[in-house]
Amino acid sequence: MSLAGGRAPRKTAGNRLSGLLEAEEEDEFYQTTYGGFTEESGDDEYQGDQSDTEDEVDSDFDIDEGDEPSSDGEAEEPRRKRRVVTKAYKEPLKSLRPRKVSTPASSSQKAREEKTLLPLELQDDGSDSRKSMRQSTAEHTRQTFLRVQERQGQSRRRKGPHCERPLTQEELLREAKITEELNLRSLETYERLEADKKKQVHKKRKCPGPIITYHSVTVPLVGEPGPKEENVDVEGLDPAPTASALAPHAGTGTGAAAATPPAHCSRTFITFSDDATFEEWFPQGRPPKVPVREVCPVTHRPALYRDPVTDIPYATARAFKIIREAYKKYITAHGLPPTASALGPGPPPPEPLPGSGPRALRQKIVIK
């Protein structure tokens, strides 16, 4: 802890401070920089001697580095610097009295005439503004003003009192007829332009010839209704569930059905422009031959069977027995047919040609 911080302050502290401030020398920097901070009376314009405005070079620049000054005790002279004026520029006041211009007597009369012809705005202007204007500009302005006055006078004479009278009904009808004709012509022109515009519109080119269109879409899947279940009461089985037991199951089924989105399936459609193209790509085969309905020769009914030996159709067992008995009598009288004897013991016959079968090799026996 220092002694100055612990002792009591002196009663005479600061008495000599005001004297020191008054005795303090004014700094040369504040007196010379930017022209100084003191205002001088009557310093309207900057005036200075030629010696004040010239820049002075320090004496140190004239002496070489190797040379030493001859005397160290000589006092250096105060350096004088150029004073800079910082006050705002003021324009000199204009004299209120107009300057007199000597003009001949003949020109004064002409000027009076021009003054009467010029507008009031040009007459009220001061003499300085009139003299500053170029002579050619003033002449053009005067001529323009004269032309405007002349036109205004002519228009007043032409107009005179004018009263518009109301049109009669006949005149209104004439104007309406003329307007109607103009509107009709305008409408015809508009319609003609619209027709020309439609003709110029590029029409879509149609593809000549047959067209096959392929179109694939997604459609919701519709399920087939399942078989309806019937409740069957059987004695001895579990009792019917109560309403409390069915409630949660019913709610669960409804929620599951609502949460499950419907299924979708794709469908593809192929469209042909004409039937000829369809038949070309999907040719139809020859219609199958309708088999001839054979009749039993014994009962004259539609034959349901065929005898493998005689190849004769028959309808009933009684007809079959009659056919076999007739076949035995034929063999006894005429013997076996040549095809039957050839099919006896021996090597197997060659394979039949296409279109020929065992029925073609058999010889039908006509029963009388």
Swiss-Prot record:
Tissue expr: In all tissues examined, most abundantly in brain and thymus.
Any Pfam family: YL1
Coiled coil: none
Annotated compartments: Nucleus
Feature: compositional bias, Basic and acidic residues: 127-142
DNA-binding region: 156-206
Cross-link Glycyl lysine isopeptide (Lys-Gly) (interchain with G-Cter in SUMO2) per UniProt, renumbered positions: 115
Keywords from the named record: Chromatin regulator, DNA-binding, Isopeptide bond, Nucleus, Phosphoprotein, Transcription, Transcription regulation, Ubl conjugation
GO MF term list: DNA binding; histone binding; histone chaperone activity
Compositional bias of kind Acidic residues: 40-75
Residues modified as Phosphoserine: 127, 129
UniProt region (Disordered), positions on chain: 1-164, 339-361
Subunit and interaction comment: Component of the NuA4 histone acetyltransferase complex which contains the catalytic subunit KAT5/TIP60 and the subunits EP400, TRRAP/PAF400, BRD8/SMAP, EPC1, DMAP1/DNMAP1, RUVBL1/TIP49, RUVBL2, ING3, actin, ACTL6A/BAF53A, MORF4L1/MRG15, MORF4L2/MRGX, MRGBP, YEATS4/GAS41 and VPS72/YL1. Component of a NuA4-related complex which contains EP400, TRRAP/PAF400, SRCAP, BRD8/SMAP, EPC1, DMAP1/DNMAP1, RUVBL1/TIP49, RUVBL2, actin, ACTL6A/BAF53A, VPS72 and YEATS4/GAS41. Also part of a multiprotein complex which contains SRCAP and which binds to H2AZ1/H2AZ.
Family to which this protein belongs: Belongs to the VPS72/YL1 family.
Protein role: Deposition-and-exchange histone chaperone specific for H2AZ1, specifically chaperones H2AZ1 and deposits it into nucleosomes. As component of the SRCAP complex, mediates the ATP-dependent exchange of histone H2AZ1/H2B dimers for nucleosomal H2A/H2B, leading to transcriptional regulation of selected genes by chromatin remodeling.
Protein name: Vacuolar protein sorting-associated protein 72 homolog
Encoding gene per record: Vps72
